[in-house]
């Protein structure tokens, strides 16, 4: 059966890939500009705006909307307040529209719950749609390219019907979000049918939407009522929240034996580290810090990444650490008290329920994984008893590397962060578009975002000729994306880098790197026509040498060029304002 293809006859002024918070903020800035009494003819004519979203409705981290989870930032760092406090899509306006403003004030806290913030984002998404912004949900973008007229063509596929849609736009904004990063030792299991059916291996991004199915698979045929043991890989905020929620769920399941249910947090460092959210450190997330970061040398940007990494990476909010260590009840300390009492009284618990244990497996690195599918269950067949755990992890203590530990688990949850690399593959697969940026189908070992300031914007061609790069330019316009350090298992041990290369060095080893230049206002800067002509081959169409007309922007992937706040919500409002202003700026 052939796929149906539908081509839009509209030439859009702007198409956005994705409709998460970043692009909702862009849409909000456009709606505000349209409504402004100072809007000019150009902004009033800039009305054909479309966003394409893979999910069938607006969603924001549905897998991590764990009951009781709190945001880590002030409600004032919303979609618009730092850009324009008068905007209709501020968090305060949301509260007022829901008749909860006074109640929120009475809470005495500036951080909303994650559940409430997700509802706010959905409210804002509906608002911009009601005010002229079109959103096509349920379509996954599969290709982008430039056409003969210099417009950007977008190809998407309906996630339900597989119908193919094509669109054309004068401007493009790419806000890809993050895709789950899975340790290489665990990744092969993500395609195992029995694992998929039972949700016994998950990324934390899918935790809440899959955990019920996981527990159904664990308890479906456990006639022996043996205790369960679940591994949580990672040492950051998500890992701690997932571990606490697993403990709560396991504590209500009866078991038989002297040892109850357990949750093992497998972390690469010696302990859970608290996030640095002190006022002075938080200044690194201020909008004006973006200017400092962008204008700094490569050396200084690397130094700032190292200095401020404890504000966001592989760290846990102190309140959550206290929950793991001291409260609900005293968890780890209370477990030690229980052990001492049991040993003194010779108590041997043989059945019933009791609080599940959380164990911190510190300084651990995952060496290998064995999966025994005979101990898994298939929901499509007759239930069978799980006599033992399905997964065996071989762990190596980094302090005693010659000693290996084999631990059996019933399920594995990977709270190992995200990667933001998929969007660059569309440039590499394109026939024309990628070549404007020096990216061809054959690719390079790495594609690296590099800041290019107007003060340094001599002919862009000279920046692609290493012999012509002056020492002043090369100190700022140089390799920029921070690689994850360590082995392939660095993510498995809960150690995340500040960002990942746009393409993996191991994928195309031995080839030269490509610098992908970006402006202060998040616009990708193409190689000029003369340099582009040098890359043409006999197979290229004659139209490919045309100077690029469209503008392309990226959001949420420029951490090393624009600062640590770029993948977070902290500057989402001001950034949207800057992108929209640049859209209307004259060349």
Curated annotation (Swiss-Prot):
Binding site for FAD: 53-61, 72, 567-569
Keyword presence, Oxidoreductase: yes
Biochemical pathway: Siderophore biosynthesis; ferrichrome biosynthesis
Pfam family, one: Lys_Orn_oxgnase
Cited Gene3D superfamilies: FAD/NAD(P)-binding domain
Key words, A-Z: FAD, Flavoprotein, Monooxygenase, NADP, Oxidoreductase
Gene Ontology terms for molecular function: ornithine N5-monooxygenase activity
Reactions the enzyme catalyzes: L-ornithine + NADPH + O2 = N(5)-hydroxy-L-ornithine + NADP(+) + H2O; L-ornithine + NADH + O2 = N(5)-hydroxy-L-ornithine + NAD(+) + H2O
Binding site for substrate: 77, 282-285, 312, 570
EC number of the protein: 1.14.13.196
Domain of life from the UniProt record: Eukaryota
Cofactor(s) needed: FAD
GO biological process: ferrichrome biosynthetic process; intracellular iron ion homeostasis
Residue spans crossing the bilayer: none
Co-factor remark: Binds 1 FAD per subunit.
Residue ranges with Polar residues bias: 491-505
InterPro entries assigned to the protein according to its UniProt record, in alphabetical order: FAD/NAD-bd_sf, Lys/Orn_oxygenase
Positions of NADP(+) binding: 235-238, 312-314
SUPFAM superfamilies: FAD/NAD(P)-binding domain
Region annotation (Disordered) ranges: 488-511
Complex and partners: Homotetramer.
PANTHER family for this protein: L-ORNITHINE N(5)-MONOOXYGENASE (PTHR42802:SF1), MONOOXYGENASE (PTHR42802)
Similarity field: Belongs to the lysine N(6)-hydroxylase/L-ornithine N(5)-oxygenase family.
Function noted in UniProt: L-ornithine N(5)-monooxygenase; part of the siderophore biosynthetic pathway. Omphalotus olearius produces ferrichrome A, but no other siderophore has been detected. Ferrichrome A consists of a hexapeptide ring made up of one glycine, two serine, and three N(5)-hydroxyornithine amino acid residues, the latter acylated by trans-(alpha-methyl)-glutaconic acid residues. The biosynthesis of ferrichrome A depends on the hydroxylation of ornithine to N(5)-hydroxyornithine, catalyzed by the monooxygenase omo1.
Identification of the protein by name: L-ornithine N(5)-monooxygenase
Organism for this UniProt entry: Omphalotus olearius
Gene expressing this chain: omo1
